[in-house]
UniProtKB/Swiss-Prot annotation:
<dbReference type="InterPro" id="IPR047296">
    <property type="entry name" value="GIY-YIG_UvrC_Cho"/>
</dbReference>
<comment type="function">
    <text>The UvrABC repair system catalyzes the recognition and processing of DNA lesions. UvrC both incises the 5' and 3' sides of the lesion. The N-terminal half is responsible for the 3' incision and the C-terminal half is responsible for the 5' incision.</text>
</comment>
<protein>
    <recommendedName>
        <fullName>UvrABC system protein C</fullName>
    </recommendedName>
</protein>
<dbReference type="GO" id="GO:0005737">
    <property type="term" value="C:cytoplasm"/>
</dbReference>
<comment type="similarity">
    <text>Belongs to the UvrC family.</text>
</comment>
<dbReference type="InterPro" id="IPR036876">
    <property type="entry name" value="UVR_dom_sf"/>
</dbReference>
<keyword id="KW-0234">DNA repair</keyword>
<dbReference type="Pfam" id="PF22920">
    <property type="entry name" value="UvrC_RNaseH"/>
</dbReference>
<dbReference type="InterPro" id="IPR010994">
    <property type="entry name" value="RuvA_2-like"/>
</dbReference>
<feature type="region of interest" description="Disordered">
    <location>
        <begin position="604"/>
        <end position="623"/>
    </location>
</feature>
<dbReference type="GO" id="GO:0009380">
    <property type="term" value="C:excinuclease repair complex"/>
</dbReference>
<keyword id="KW-0228">DNA excision</keyword>
<dbReference type="InterPro" id="IPR004791">
    <property type="entry name" value="UvrC"/>
</dbReference>
<keyword id="KW-0742">SOS response</keyword>
<dbReference type="Pfam" id="PF14520">
    <property type="entry name" value="HHH_5"/>
</dbReference>
<dbReference type="InterPro" id="IPR001943">
    <property type="entry name" value="UVR_dom"/>
</dbReference>
<dbReference type="InterPro" id="IPR038476">
    <property type="entry name" value="UvrC_RNase_H_dom_sf"/>
</dbReference>
Length: 623
């Protein structure tokens, strides 16, 4: 049966429809008050003229549907099916930022800890929390007052003695037989769940009953501890009431779009204060409709998230707004309103978020060329430097298992790389694989020379590496009497920037931050330059050592071959005619004879430090 014929047989009831391709894969999920009317609209001339709808109908070979009682049920089912199938024609939430939850595990002795990954493992997840450190503060409070741990000790068996957490009263000690009972531990976990769920009155009531029972049984120390905990819980409840009176929890959404490119900003207000901001981006919204876009996103965000704010502010209304409000109200068990503010402070806040969405779009999608001074000031602010750095010198070490050790220094100055100032170093004093010692040597040589020549220091010295390399560079500068030199390192993979003197507060920039991209690009250029020099040095050593073993081939001939062919492999692959054009027919015959009649001799270890002695800091010949 043709797809158009199937449409005529759809009911007029509310439900969810699923378009499928020729392989039976779900490519689009939608909902409707009337299935037949909604699906039939896809075949109108106006709709088929859209790129997205036209492509969808071209690829769709079949349609399934599920009937529900009302639009609210259709909305919830649509969201679940989108999560399950991830259809490529639906607008999918791609969040680059994850927020922490507090997890209560599903174990005999549940543990409590912070996680950013939600799993279907039977555990309870509370959150997400804004700002992120709130989750860690809550878990610390739970350890201190409820003594439910987050440790990774195997709790499926007993251990001979408890860990430090038990002795400092942060754990009930379920890992050691006799320290607690199953009932006492289960009661503590119930208290934790009530606390995290915000049911402070219920928690205080239960604690008070246990306090009175302990007092009657003359367990006075336990009763005193419960009394103190009741006081703490009631104080928290009172603070929350006062905060709620000052301002509600609100999420504010704004979008800036130049289809197919879209930037979304979400501001999170908690107790009337802005506590966090999220940025999301799309590059595939060719048929962008702001109402449909926001409707789809709000369902994906809030139907899958435990916390729902009292108000959600959006720039435009959308079709299923009331149904979504009802669902979220049921989920929150308190009234949830989705509004489009028209005046006053709420309208002004929405305008602020819209401005930020436009800036996010520009930063992500436009080719911006800020002034050199603006870049320097942004870098100064991000790394908390004393001055805006107009010149950055970046170092990297390269070797293979401690052999052919070299270093590079590249220079960024006034907004661009300055290749004429690049330097490369052959490591002289370090034996074996010791990157820290190599970094000390190179930094010492570079800045001792600047001191001798009375040259100014750069605005920032950047090291490719982690804390070890950073401290090695700092030790080298201190040893030659250079103090207060701005110094930082960027660790590979984690992309965390450490600033010397501020190591306890590493700089973690957004992965789309232009400052992070700048630091990464300088670091990557230093790495490229070091690896290129290392490879060249290794090839030179291999080529020289092997060709020197050929009878009748002198040093000048070797240098000609090296200059022309660059590597041993290319010399081996060259024909006699190709070799003869470089070194003459007689030498070419000797090279060919060597490779056709004699096995290559083992490579002797050759010293290459002499070239470095002549020129300690060698400018890049390609610059």
């Amino acid at each position: 049966m043709e797809l158009r014929d199937k449409v005529g047989q759809l009911p007029f009831s509310p439900g969810v429809y699923l378009y499928k391709d020729s392989g039976g894969k779900v490519i689009y999920v939608g909902k409707a008050k009337s299935l037949r009317n909604r699906v039939r609209s896809y075949f109108s001339e106006d709709k088929l003229g859209d790129i997205k709808t036209g492509t969808l109908i071209t690829e769709a070979c079949d349609i399934d549907y599920i009937l529900v009682d009302n639009e609210k049920e259709a909305l919830a089912l649509e969201n679940n099916l989108i999560k399950q199938y991830k259809p490529r024609f639906n607008i999918l939430l791609r969040d680059d930022k994850t927020y922490p939850y507090v997890k209560v595990t599903n174990e005999k002795y549940p543990r409590v800890y912070v996680t950013r990954r939600l799993r279907k493992d039977g555990a309870q997840y509370f959150g997400p929390f804004f700002p992120a450190n709130l989750a860690h503060r809550l878990v610390h409070f739970i350890h201190r007052h409820f003594q439910v741990p987050s440790c990774k000790v195997d709790l499926t068996r007993f251990h001979p003695k408890p860990c430090l957490q038990f002795h400092i009263h942060r754990c009930l000690g379920p890992c050691v037989q006799g320290l607690t009972t199953d009932e006492a531990y289960a009661a503590a976990v119930r208290d934790v769940r009530l606390f995290l769920d915000g049911r402070h009155s219920d928690l205080a009531r239960g604690l008070r009953a246990r306090m009175e029972a302990a007092s009657l049984e003359m367990r006075f120390e336990e009763a005193a501890g419960l009394r103190d905990l009741i006081t703490t819980v009631e104080e928290i409840e009172e603070r929350q009431k006062m905060a709620a009176a000052k301002g509600d929890d609100v999420d504010i959404f704004a979008v800036y779009a130049e289809p197919p490119l879209v930037a979304l900003n979400i501001f999170h207000l908690r107790n009337g204060q802005i506590v966090d901001r999220r940025e999301l981006f799309w590059e595939d919204q060719f048929e962008y409709d702001e109402s449909l876009f926001l409707s789809s996103l709000l369902k994906q965000i809030y139907l899958d998230q435990q916390f729902v704010p009292a108000e959600i502010h959006v720039p435009v209304e959308f079709e299923d707004l009331e149904a979504l409000e009802e669902l979220l109200t049921e989920k929150r068990q308190r009234r949830v309103e989705i509004r489009t503010p028209q005046r006053g402070q709420k309208k002004a806040l929405l305008g602020l978020v819209e401005t930020n969405a436009k800036h996010s779009f520009d930063a992500r999608f436009r080719v911006l060329k800020p002034s050199s001074r603006a870049i320097q000031e942004a870098l100064q602010d991000a790394l908390n430097l004393p001055d805006a750095p107009s010149r950055i010198e970046c170092f990297d070490i390269s070797h293979i298992q401690g052999t052919d050790k070299v270093a590079s220094m590249v220079v960024w100055e006034d907004g661009k790389m300055k290749k004429s100032d690049y330097r490369k170093f052959i490591i002289r004093t370090v034996v074996g694989n010791d990157d820290f010692a190599s970094m000390r040597e190179v930094v010492t040589r570079r800045y001792s020379r600047l001191q001798e020549e009375k040259q100014p220091m750069p605005g920032l010295v950047l090291i490719d590496g982690g804390l070890g390399q950073l401290h090695a560079a700092a030790e080298a500068l201190e040893a030659i009497g250079i103090a207060d030199q701005p110094l930082a390192s960027i660790a590979k993979r984690e992309e965390i920037i450490y600033v010397f003197g501020q190591e306890d507060e590493p700089v973690v920039l957004d992965r789309f931050s232009p400052i992070l991209h700048l630091v990464q690009s300088i670091r990557d250029e230093a790495h490229r330059f070091a690896v290129t020099f290392h490879r060249s040095l290794r090839n030179t050593r291999q080529l020289t050592s092997e060709l020197d073993a050929i009878r009748g081939v002198g040093a000048k001939t070797v240098q000609k071959l090296l200059k022309e062919f660059g590597s041993l492999e290319r010399v081996r692959a060259a024909t006699e005619t190709q070799l003869a054009t470089v070194v003459g027919r007689a030498a070419a015959k000797r090279v060919i004879a060597h490779y056709t009649t004699v096995e290559a001799a083992p490579e002797p270890v050759a010293s290459v430090a002499q070239s470095e002695d002549a020129a300690p800091d060698v400018p890049d010949p390609q610059a």
